[in-house]
Amino acid sequence: MQIYVVKQGDTLSAIASQYRTTTNDITETNEIPNPDSLVVGQTIVIPIAGQFYDVKRGDTLTSIARQFNTTAAELARVNRIQLNTVLQIGFRLYIPPAPKRDIESNAYLEPRGNQVSENLQQAAREASPYLTYLGAFSFQAQRNGTLVAPPLTNLRSITESQNTTLMMIITNLENQAFSDELGRILLNDETVKRRLLNEIVENARRYGFRDIHFDFEYLRPQDREAYNQFLREARDLFHREGLEISTALAPKTSATQQGRWYEAHDYRAHGEIVDFVVLMTYEWGYSGGPPQAVSPIGPVRDVIEYALTEMPANKIVMGQNLYGYDWTLPYTAGGTPARAVSPQQAIVIADQNNASIQYDQTAQAPFFRYTDAENRRHEVWFEDARSIQAKFNLIKELNLRGISYWKLGLSFPQNWLLLSDQFNVVKKTFR
């Protein structure tokens, strides 16, 4: 598939004609919210096999082949040119589709209230073909070792219809915040621990969960080894029951990184104990902080490269946001938090406010600024086809196990287009 960036004066019909496709195909596959008023800088995924590349100054067949993980000989063959051809700037090369590799993908779902809303159920139905796992956030562990379940309306039937594995997410949330005291009890009180693990197995059987995913955050640093031992005991029990075990890890760049979020998460131990880990590689840009990319490529790479020193690549699942933020300027610490927006909403906001979308090459993320009806300045950072492609390239380069999305309900159709175009999503079979 081709990623196209809208330029001044572009129309869908002209773009479709250029790539020998139709406006309907482009509109429907991208679910374009503004087909009659494209935004400069907006990305469009062209639904064609392979893609085209326009030669730039300094390019050679070899350098282009390296960029697209193919060979100069193959590019020469499919484009019917000589291997030693001197490429002219602007010459258009066809890049054939690369072989797909297997990947595991997960998405979190966060229901509110007493049932899963119809909108979230529909999001789960639409995403499930592209997912290995779907996780309902979350089963909240209690101080006595019991569990409070989240709404699960129709999730079992939705996942079973697409052979998607239902993930059971266990948290140390208490009063809507991660609790280190709750964590201390769960990890250190033997009676509570045994009850919790048995409750997890019983609920997994009842609801059809096959992966048990621990998202224990902001634990006390002194509970680091207690958490490791808890996971060893959980793994032994779950594996006997035919269940997988996984964990969510704070985005660390060293074993000695300081901070409440990081210190109790032992990358090496988790890599040895559990079946896979999800690295929470997002929220550099967050609602209470200054405007910036939510998951800039450099910091994401730094976390993964550290993780690779502690565990094998086939246990690492990269976390990825399905959202961005709209900040009101000027940013002031403790002021009005930024508003979460989906990639589709971001495009609509840019269109309504006549804003052009820019792209930060360092962060590999799109952004724009606008002035609202009350004359307040805003800055929006979000995701588009280019930014998610940068993450897919990182997965391929570092040979990671897969990708995990936080969270469904925020529309980003281009992600699923590119995911299915470049990867075979693994579907699990359990005995």
Swiss-Prot record:
GO cellular component terms attached to this protein's record: endomembrane system
One GO BP annotation of this record: carbohydrate metabolic process
GO terms for MF: chitin binding; hydrolase activity, acting on glycosyl bonds; oligosaccharide binding
Knockout mutant characteristics: Inactivation of the gene does not impair vegetative growth nor prevent the development of resistance to heat, chloroform and lysozyme. According to Kodama et al, the germination of the mutant spores induced by L-alanine is defective. However Chirakkal et al reported that the mutant shows wild-type germination kinetics in L-alanine.
Entry annotation: catalytic residues: E217
GH18 domain mapped to chain residues: 103-431
UniProt binding sites for chitin: V148, A149, E174, N175, Q176, A177, Y218, M280, T281, Y282, E283, W406
Domain LysM per the UniProt entry, residue ranges: 2-46, 51-95
Induction, as annotated: Expression is regulated by the sporulation transcription factor sigma E.
First-listed, main subcellular location of the protein, grouped into a coarse class: other
Protein family membership: Belongs to the glycosyl hydrolase 18 family. Chitinase class II subfamily.
Reported function: N-acetylglucosaminidase involved in cortex peptidoglycan degradation during germination. Cleaves only partially degraded spore peptidoglycans. Recognizes muramic acid delta-lactam residues specific to spore peptidoglycans.
Protein name: Cortical fragment-lytic enzyme
Natural source organism: Bacillus subtilis (strain 168)
